[in-house]
UniProtKB/Swiss-Prot annotation:
Belongs to the PPR family. PCMP-E subfamily. This is Pentatricopeptide repeat-containing protein At2g34400. Residues 579-610 are annotated as: Type E(+) motif. It comes from the Eukaryota. Residues 502-578 are annotated as: Type E motif. The keyword Repeat applies. PANTHER family: (WILD MALAYSIAN BANANA) HYPOTHETICAL PROTEIN (PTHR47926:SF543), PENTATRICOPEPTIDE REPEAT-CONTAINING PROTEIN (PTHR47926). One of its GO terms (molecular function) is RNA binding.
Length: 621
């Protein structure tokens, strides 16, 4: 006797209808037709939550319908990693459909790309042959991990199954090779596509943009238009990334106008890219305008605007927007929290940083590698090395940025020995950023020989090419040690053109050491730099000339500063009062501090100082 004869469809429909009140009776009339498996497939199509899916699974078990391959795609579609993994683990023989959905979920939804590749290998080991859908997501995973070796191996297997000419797979291959730094090969694949569509152009333009080949992306975009292809949202998003890289505000504005002309809606994806582009180009007003125009603002849009404020030194605005985001009910993710922590570190907002750590714990994000690295960086910049070390040691996984943050925290707080010991412990290959922290530690501690040794080890042991920041550190190290001749010789060895920061280190030492010959050469070089915008260098040079009783030359240096439009950046301080960050600028009035009562508070403080008989000069805030 069949299962269908034992259990009436009406009874099954009524049982599930009680738990699916949103399903209409008419839909169950349709569900009564056919066998039970078809009934369950019908219900799975209508399922809109994990809770409903669990109820369907319970009914399937109750009616002895063992079809876990039915459930896995819907669980992945609903985005529940734990439930999807459970269903997959209890499935004795997952089919193509289940493997493909799990690999897609791991790649696109859960960003566990290593697990996606592992599942691909398991699929092959089980005897199932990957198809074009499998390969697409495998190449995406390789791109995200920059696993060029695995990608090439999988690419070679396409020829065995006759998929080497599949257009959709080639699009994924272009992205993978570009992401892995093989831009030339990506372009070769693109040129071999005989019938290109918009997706083909987007793949190559996006590949160029993400790999940092912004000019090539621009050139290909123009060629795309010349050949009559209409750009879509993805095209504009990739081009906005290229504009950000080049700082090309004019083209960025034209792209926004193009989106309006072609009636490409301001989605959160496009809007967020516009915000980031305007932020990278320094146009904060336009970034905020786009943000305000967005009807639907998701977490990505909020984070993009907060990042713009943080990266442009507007920490107070970043904090305000973060609190506003939470009030609207949008929950922050690891990217949001790490951005806010960066803003906290830049202004020394320690108490707010502590609140963010508590908030991260509430969201179970305290061990997220980006959040934890942000905490290490924030505590280090706020002078709390012990707290930075606490977070660092508790991290289950550390990447290069984590080690760099802790080394830099030690270096900037004068703990050179600890910084160098930590560098020796480093379990991942160091980068040029790592050596900036290491050399900075040597500068703070006056470790001349060690600093020079680390500088040479960059290239001899680690194959890294020293950049201007590394040369500047060594010049600063030698200058502070009074080795001005050596510092000057070292600067002359720099393969590029010395900048004003290098000269600042030498001029500062000359001012203290009274080295006339070198300071004259340094000042002459500074005056020849038409692009020099560091006000401190002009002030130091003017003071040096004044010390030499060269009053006319000192005045000329100040005049040169004015002629070049160099303005001395006003002193700026921040203070946290009752959870509010107040900003004070030298020369500003009271109301710019963000509190109307700040002026009266300051007056009371002055009166209190008078009563305590403190001596002070004229103060103007």
């Amino acid at each position: 006797m069949s299962l269908q004869m034992l259990i009436k469809p009406e009874k099954l429909a009524f049982s599930i209808y009680r738990q699916f009140p949103k399903f209409k009776p008419r839909q169950f009339e349709e569900a009564r037709r056919g066998d039970l498996e078809r009934d369950f497939l019908f219900l799975l199509k209508k399922c809109i939550s994990v809770n409903q899916l669990r109820q369907i699974q319970a009914q399937m078990l109750l009616h002895s319908v063992e079809k876990p391959n039915f459930l896995i795609p819907k669980a992945v579609e609903l985005g529940d990693f734990n439930y999807s993994s459970f269903l997959f683990s209890v499935t004795e023989e997952p089919n193509h459909y289940s493997f493909n959905y799990m690999i897609r979920g791991l790649t696109n939804t859960w960003n566990d790309h290593e697990a996606a590749l592992s599942l691909y290998r398991r699929m092959k080991f089980s005897g199932l042959k990957p198809d074009k859908f499998t390969y697409n997501f495998v190449f995406i995973a390789c791109a995200k991990l920059e696993e060029i070796g695995v990608g090439r191996s999988v690419h070679s297997s396409l020829f065995k199954v006759g998929l080497e000419r599949d257009v959709h797979i080639n699009h994924s291959l272009i992205m993978m090779y570009a992401k892995c730094g093989q831009v030339g090969y990506a372009r070769k694949l693109f040129d071999e596509i005989t019938e290109r569509d918009t997706v083909s152009w987007n793949s190559m333009i996006s590949g160029y943009s993400e790999a940092g080949y912004a000019k090539d992306a621009m050139d290909l975009f123009r060629k795309m238009e010349e050949e009559g292809f209409e750009p879509d949202e993805r095209t504009l998003v990739s081009m906005l990334g290229a504009c950000s890289h080049l700082g090309d505000l004019r083209t960025g504005r034209l792209l926004e106008e193009m989106a309006i002309t072609k009636k490409i809606g301001l989605s959160t994806f496009l809007g967020s890219k516009l915000i980031s582009m305007y932020g990278k180009c320094g146009d904060l007003d336009s970034a905020r305008r786009v943000f305000n125009q967005m009807i639907k603002k998701d977490r990505v849009a909020w984070t993009a605007m907060i990042t713009v404020y943080s990266q442009n030194g507007k920490s107070s605005e970043a904090f305000k927007l973060f609190f506003e985001m939470e009030k609207t009910g949008v929950s922050p993710d690891a990217g949001t929290l790490s951005t806010v922590l960066s803003a906290c570190g830049s202004v020394g907002a320690l108490e707010l940083g502590k609140q963010i750590e508590t908030h991260a714990s509430e969201l179970s994000l305290q061990h997220n590698i980006y959040v934890a690295t942000g905490l290490v960086d924030m505590y280090g910049k706020c002078g709390r090395v012990e707290e930075a070390l606490r977070v660092f040691e508790a991290m289950p996984v550390k990447n290069e940025a984590t080690w760099n943050a802790m080394i830099t925290a030690y270096a900037h707080q004068g703990h050179a020995k600890e910084a160098l010991l930590l560098f020796d412990r480093m379990s991942v290959p160091p980068s040029d950023i790592t050596f900036i922290g290491v050399l900075s530690a040597c500068v703070h501690a006056g470790l001349v020989h060690q600093g020079c040794r680390y500088f040479h080890e960059m290239s001899s042991m680690f194959g890294l090419v020293p950049k201007i920041e590394h040369y500047t550190n060594i010049i600063d190290l030698l200058s502070r040690a009074g080795m001005l001749d050596e510092a000057w010789e070292f600067m002359e060895r720099f393969p590029g053109k010395p900048d004003e920061i290098m000269l600042a280190a030498i001029l500062g030492a000359c001012h203290k050491r009274k080295d006339v010959a070198i300071r004259e050469k340094a000042m002459r070089m500074l005056m020849e730099m038409k692009e020099a915008k560091n006000a401190g260098n002009y002030v130091i040079s003017s003071n040096v000339l004044a010390d030499m009783k060269m009053w006319d030359e000192s005045a000329k240096m100040r005049a040169l500063m004015r002629d070049r439009g160099v303005v001395k950046t006003p002193g700026c301080s921040w203070i946290e009062i009752e959870g509010e960050l107040m900003e004070f600028l030298a020369g500003s009035d009271y109301l710019q501090c963000g509190r109307e009562d700040s002026g009266s508070l300051f007056d009371l403080l002055v009166e209190e100082m008078k009563r305590e008989r403190y001596e002070f000069g004229y103060i103007h805030l």
